[in-house]
C-alpha cells in the first residue's frame, strides 16, 4: 500500500492505516530477511555518505588521480556537500551548487539554477579550455558584459547548444546582488524537479 507521510505525524503511531502495517513488513524484510540472505553481506558494507565522507571522497579521488585541489570541480546540492565545497574552495578548485538548498548556495562559489544538467556540461567545457577563471568570468555580473569571447570547439558547443535549447538556466556567483532571492530560485527549482518532500531534505 501507499505510505502517506502526513505533515502532523511525529511518530509511526500517528500514521493512518495501513501505513504502520506496511512499515512493519518493510522492517522485517530489511532487518531480518535480507541480512539472513547471501546478498545481506552487501548491506553490511554500505557506508552512508554524509558531509565528512564526501569531503574524504574528494581527497581520495585526488590521491588516486594525482591531481590537485585546484583541478577539482565539485557539484553539490545540500548541506552534506558543504564540507566538500569548503575544502575545494580552500584549495582553489571550483565549487558549484546545482539547484541547491540555502546551505549549498551559501557555501558554493558558483550557483546554477536549471531544469537540466546541460549547464553543468557547458561549465565543465569552459573549465577544460579556460580554467576556473573562465567560469567565474561568465558567472560574475560585473565581468559578464565585458568578458572575453570564450570560444569553445564546434564539436563541444554544438551538442551543448542543442541540450540547452528551450531549457531554463541561470548562473550566479557569490557577488549576486540579492543572494536570498537566488536561494529562493534555487530551492524552487529543486522542489519542482524533485518534489517538495525530497527537496526539503538538507
Role assignments for model-derived ranges:
Residues 1-202:
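C-terminal cap/substrate-recognition subdomain and adjoining C-terminal extension
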Amino acid at each position: 500500500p501507499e505510505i502517506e507521510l502526513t505533515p502532523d505525524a511525529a511518530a509511526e503511531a500517528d500514521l493512518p492505516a495501513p501505513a504502520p502495517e506496511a512499515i512493519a513488513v518493510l522492517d522485517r524484510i530489511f532487518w531480518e530477511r535480507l541480512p539472513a540472505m547471501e546478498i545481506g553481506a552487501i548491506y553490511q558494507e554500505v557506508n552512508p555518505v554524509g558531509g565528512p565522507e564526501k569531503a574524504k571522497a574528494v581527497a581520495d579521488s585526488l590521491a588516486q588521480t594525482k591531481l590537485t585541489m585546484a583541478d577539482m570541480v565539485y557539484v553539490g546540492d545540500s548541506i552534506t556537500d558543504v564540507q566538500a565545497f569548503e575544502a575545494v574552495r580552500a584549495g582553489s578548485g571550483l565549487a558549484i551548487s546545482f539547484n541547491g538548498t540555502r546551505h549549498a548556495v551559501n557555501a558554493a562559489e558558483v550557483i546554477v539554477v536549471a531544469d537540466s544538467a546541460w549547464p553543468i556540461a557547458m561549465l565543465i567545457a569552459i573549465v577544460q579550455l579556460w580554467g576556473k577563471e573562465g567560469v567565474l568570468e561568465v558567472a560574475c555580473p560585473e565581468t559578464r558584459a565585458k568578458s572575453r569571447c570564450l570560444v569553445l570547439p564546434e564539436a563541444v558547443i554544438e551538442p551543448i547548444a542543442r541540450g540547452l535549447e528551450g531549457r531554463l538556466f541561470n548562473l550566479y556567483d557569490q557577488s549576486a546582488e540579492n543572494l536570498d532571492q537566488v536561494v529562493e530560485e534555487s530551492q524552487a527549482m529543486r522542489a519542482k524537479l524533485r518534489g517538495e518532500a525530497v527537496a526539503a531534505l538538507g
